[in-house]
C-alpha cells in the first residue's frame, strides 16, 4: 500500500518481522501483506496509459473491498476483546487507533462512491491519483497498527 513502486520490499520485511515477533497478530500482518499486493496490482493498472480491462479492474476493486472488510472483522475478533479488556492498555492510544480506523473506513467508502467504473474510465489519470491517496492512507494506518497497536498484544 506504499507509494507506487516504492518500499514494497521494505514493507514486506516489516510485515514479516511483525508477523513472526507478535504471534497473536501474525494473521493480521499477513492480511496487510495481501492487501498491499492487491493495492500494488491496482496501482500498476492505474499507471498504464488508459483504462482498458474492465473485468480485471472490477475484480481488483471487489478483491480489495473484501480483503479490507475481512481484515477489519479479523481485527475486531483478534484484538477487540484483548485490547479493550486488558488492564494497563493505554486508553488514549486505543482511542486514537479507533479514530484512525473509522477515518480510513469512511475515506475508503467515499472513494468507492466517488469513483464508479464510468468515472474512473472517464478520467483515468485523476482516478490513479485518487487511488494513490487512498492507498497512502491505508498504508499509514497499517504501519501504525504494526508498530503501535499489534505489539501491545504480545
Map each language-model feature to its residues.
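Small-residue-biased structural context
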Residues: 1-154
Amino acid at each position: 500500500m506504499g507509494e507506487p513502486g516504492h518500499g514494497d520490499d521494505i514493507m514486506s520485511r516489516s510485515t514479516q518481522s511483525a508477523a513472526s515477533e507478535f504471534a497473536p497478530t501474525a494473521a493480521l500482518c499477513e492480511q496487510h501483506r495481501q492487501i498491499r499486493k492487491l493495492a500494488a496490482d491496482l496501482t500498476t493498472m492505474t499507471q498504464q496509459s488508459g483504462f482498458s480491462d474492465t473485468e480485471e479492474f472490477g475484480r481488483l476493486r471487489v478483491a480489495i473491498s473484501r480483503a479490507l472488510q475481512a481484515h477489519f472483522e479479523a481485527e475486531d475478533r483478534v484484538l477487540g476483546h484483548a485490547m479493550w479488556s486488558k488492564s494497563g492498555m493505554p486508553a488514549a492510544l486505543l482511542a486514537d487507533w479507533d479514530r484512525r480506523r473509522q477515518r480510513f473506513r469512511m475515506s475508503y467508502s467515499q472513494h468507492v462512491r466517488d469513483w464508479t467504473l464510468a468515472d474512473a474510465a472517464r478520467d483515468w489519470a485523476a482516478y490513479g491519483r485518487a487511488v494513490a491517496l487512498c492507498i497512502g492512507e491505508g498504508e499509514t494506518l497499517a504501519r501504525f497498527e504494526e508498530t503501535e497497536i499489534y505489539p501491545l498484544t504480545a
